[in-house]
């Protein structure tokens, strides 16, 4: 926060490097059950003010996979799906979807090999309060399959 980037003003606040390293290690060791984006978009007016007056929050949905994949080395695709989809469903008592004939599906397609640098014009959100704009990330969500629509982002 040395440069007072209001896109980094979040609650709970960002922690020390040691805390972030411990969190990465906890994910690697399987001590973290799930990851959520806590997507909290804001209009630019609420973020282009003095740090103390800026709203808490950042967008996270569009970069959640890439940021996690970048931050946690050697995260397998299966572990990623567990953290973002399977385990949250278990925690909240939701049915886990199955793949079967005539079964409606809802999937996110991701490619862990894509290296990219998010830019404001890449975002689908109406908000752009992301601290990851201009930062190199590894892995990208490339599309969604839904009963009513197929969307590809590449």
Regions found by a protein language model. Give the residues of each.
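Histidine/acidic residue-rich metal-binding segments in metalloenzymes
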Residues: 1-35
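Short acidic, glycine/serine/threonine-rich loops at helix termini
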Residues: 1-3, 45-49, 120-122
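N-terminal start-of-chain detector that recognizes signal peptides
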Residues: 5-8, 79-82, 114-119, 123
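A generic local structural motif
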Residues: 19-23, 95-96, 130
